[in-house]
């Protein structure tokens, strides 16, 4: 299944590697370097299946921006979008926080990066997001249909 994927990674080499890997799999990929670029893309994009976020982003003002902050925004406003965290700075505590507080779908360390495991994680995340979106669409249709039937009975 092909998905719409956003990659937020400040290191150009990693951004390009991940983007190329996923485009070869047939996914529609947008790769950006900053939280602001990610927010801008999400504001204009519908049905985002997956966001792949670096935990630590060094913004142009040289402050460490936390990818967890963006993950929290995604979880709050885009419940069907899955999030995979990727980091070169992750500890077990960071990983647990990503899963417990923000319901990350998966977590990868750059030092131990396995492209096959990563592709599998992406595939599962995209599939799950699509299934959830389909279920929401079907539920919306059923609610609409029931309301129309109720209106007819009232007439």
Which residues are covered by each model-predicted region?
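Acidic, metal-coordinating helix/loop segments flanking the phosphotransfer/catalytic sites
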Residues: 6, 30-50, 54, 58-60
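Conserved active-site segment of CheY-like receiver
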Residues: 10, 86-91, 111-112
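Short amphipathic helices of CheY-like receiver
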Residues: 36, 63-72
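Conserved phosphotransfer cores of two-component systems
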Residues: 43-46, 73-81, 101-102
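Two-component signal transduction core modules
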Residues: 51, 83, 106-108
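Alpha4 helix (beta4-alpha4-beta5 surface) of REC/receiver domains from two-component response regulators
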Residues: 65, 69, 89-108
